[in-house]
């Protein structure tokens, strides 16, 4: 049952237990009439809902509750090269509220990539973005709530144990993760490979290597398994397929540099202490 609801949006709050208050914000922008045009995909909280969110945070503060924020769009830029339309438009104002009321944890989505960012500047919030369940490797998060901390661990859903005997005869269903991986890798690299084949059709092996590299770099970023050693990253950057790729597609140069992480940071698990 909702503790409170915003009359001007779909936002609401729920007191989970004696320690935590869940604040579920509505960052979507809705059309006012039917249209054949593409919908707005960027997000905004708006002044009215920001006041409502502050009301929830203040309630949590007054009742010794720890607020946890949920919304579709992102609080932080999880990729320095690609973030326009993903970070909520009024993130500055929302981050200011998170800092004022010591909001330590937020969950969001939209980018379809598994990514965790810790506190930024004066904002104490750790933001967890869980990858899209219907693509990549069917990732989902397991959140355990304790009196003095919250843990998050990314898992993979294995549906084979739930298949009927008839469904187990279906190769795609039994090997569904392979199906999703092949689909994702193919769709990511298809356009780039096609443009390369039009120009360099005499070196199909190089084009195939470029497509394979481009696909895997993206795949690793989107499922959060993008932490590698600096020596491995240097090897990738020195490879012929990488060098030709950024030469022919300079628009990818900065983006590709953001996909791997050589630090000890994890995008798969985190512990928030209170």
Regions found by a protein language model. Give the residues of each.
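Extended active-site neighborhood of metal-dependent phosphoesterases/phosphodiesterases
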Residues: 1-58, 121-128, 139-142, 150-153
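Acidic-and-aromatic substrate-binding clefts and catalytic sites of carbohydrate-active enzymes
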Residues: 4, 85, 133-136
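His/acidic metal-ligating clusters that form di-metal
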Residues: 21-23, 36-126, 186, 229
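Active-site metal-binding loops of divalent metal-dependent hydrolases
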Residues: 27-28, 73-74, 109-111, 131-132, ...
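Active-site-proximal loop/helix segment associated with metal-binding centers of metalloenzymes
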Residues: 28-51, 59-61, 65-70, 75-77, ...
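Short catalytic/ligand-binding loop motif for oxyanion handling, primarily in non-cytosolic enzymes
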Residues: 31-33, 76-79, 115-117, 135-138, ...
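A post-motif C-terminal structural segment
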Residues: 125-196
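Non-catalytic terminal accessory segments
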Residues: 164-274
């Amino acid at each position: 049952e909702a503790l409170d609801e915003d009359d001007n949006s779909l936002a609401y709050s729920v007191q989970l237990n004696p320690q935590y208050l869940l604040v579920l914000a509505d960052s979507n922008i809705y059309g006012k009439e039917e249209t054949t045009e593409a919908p707005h995909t960027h997000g905004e909280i708006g002044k009215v809902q920001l006041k409502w969110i502050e009301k929830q945070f203040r309630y949590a503060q007054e009742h010794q509750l720890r607020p946890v924020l949920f919304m579709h769009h992102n609080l932080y830029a999880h990729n320095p090269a690609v973030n326009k339309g993903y970070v909520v438009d009024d993130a500055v104002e929302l981050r200011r509220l998170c800092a004022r009321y010591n909001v330590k944890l937020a969950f969001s989505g939209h980018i379809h990539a598994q990514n965790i960012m810790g506190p930024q500047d004066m904002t104490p919030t750790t933001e967890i973005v869980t990858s899209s369940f219907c693509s990549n490797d069917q990732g989902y998060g397991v959140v355990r709530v304790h009196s003095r901390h919250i843990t998050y661990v990314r898992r993979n859903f294995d549906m084979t144990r739930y298949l009927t005997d008839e469904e187990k005869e279906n190769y795609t269903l039994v090997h569904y993760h392979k199906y999703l991986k092949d689909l994702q890798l193919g769709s990511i690299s298809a356009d780039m490979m096609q443009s390369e084949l039009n120009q360099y059709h005499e070196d199909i092996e190089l084009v195939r290597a470029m497509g394979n590299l481009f696909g895997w770099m993206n795949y690793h970023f989107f499922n959060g398994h993008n932490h590698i050693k600096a020596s491995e990253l240097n090897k990738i950057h020195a490879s012929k397929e990488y060098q030709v790729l950024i030469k022919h597609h300079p628009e990818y140069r900065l983006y590709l540099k953001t996909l791997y992480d050589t630090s000890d940071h994890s995008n798969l698990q985190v512990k928030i202490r209170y």
